A protein has these predicted regions:
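Short amphipathic alpha-helix that is part of the acyltransferase structural core
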Residues: 1-24
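Conserved beta-hairpin
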Residues: 30-44
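Glycine-rich phosphate/pyrophosphate-binding loop shared by adenosine-nucleotide-utilizing enzymes
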Residues: 40-45, 56, 126
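Conserved acetyl-CoA binding element of GNAT-fold acetyltransferases
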Residues: 53-64, 92
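Conserved acetyl-CoA-binding loop-helix of GNAT-fold acetyltransferases
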Residues: 68-79, 98-106
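Conserved GNAT acetyl-CoA-binding A-motif
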Residues: 82-93
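Conserved beta-strand-loop-alpha-helix junction that forms the acyl-donor binding cleft
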Residues: 91-101, 118
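Conserved catalytic-core motifs of GNAT/GCN5-like acyltransferases
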Residues: 110-125
C-alpha cells in the first residue's frame, strides 16, 4: 500500500527522486515535500518550491501515474491553497511528456503557454508547457 510521508528527514530523498524526473534545477534548500512510499521504497514525490506568498511551483514525479490517488491529489492542493494560502499553483512539463500532461490537466490545471528553452538536460535546452491552477477553479 502506498502512503504519503512528509517527514523532514525524508526531504533530501524525495528531492533526489523528483529532481531528475521533473527536470528541477536550483532547488536545494527552500522547499517542502510529500513523498509517496510503498513500504520503505520511494515511488513518487511532490516538491513545492519558489513560494512567494501567492504562487507556488509544484514538481511531481511518479514511477507509476496510477499511484497518485485522489486522496493524495487532495492533500497536494490543500497544502497549496489552504496551508500556504496560494492564489495559484504553477507547473511545467516538456511538450512530449503526454502522461504528465494528462495527469496535470485531469487535476484541473489550464495550459497557459509555452516557455521556450527553459528545461535543461545536459547541454540541451527544451521548451516546456506552462500550466496554472487558480484557487477558485
Amino acid at each position: 500500500m502506498i502512503v504519503a510521508k512528509t517527514d523532514k528527514s525524508l526531504a533530501q530523498e524525495v528531492l533526489k527522486f523528483v529532481a531528475p524526473r521533473a527536470n528541477i534545477q536550483g532547488v536545494h534548500s527552500d522547499f517542502t515535500h510529500i513523498g509517496y512510499y510503498d513500504g520503505d521504497k520511494i515511488v513518487g514525490g511532490t516538491i513545492f518550491s519558489h513560494y512567494d506568498g501567492f504562487n507556488i511551483w509544484m514538481h511531481l514525479a511518479l514511477d507509476n501515474p496510477r499511484a497518485m490517488r485522489r486522496s493524495y491529489a487532495k492533500q497536494v492542493f490543500e497544502y497549496c491553497f489552504y496551508t500556504c494560502k496560494c492564489v495559484r499553483v504553477t507547473a511545467m512539463t516538456k511538450p512530449n511528456n503526454i502522461r504528465c500532461r494528462k495527469l496535470i490537466e485531469s487535476a484541473g490545471f489550464k495550459q497557459e503557454g509555452i516557455v521556450r528553452k527553459v528545461i535543461r538536460e545536459g547541454m540541451k535546452f527544451h521548451n516546456a508547457v506552462l500550466y496554472g491552477l487558480l484557487r477558485n477553479e
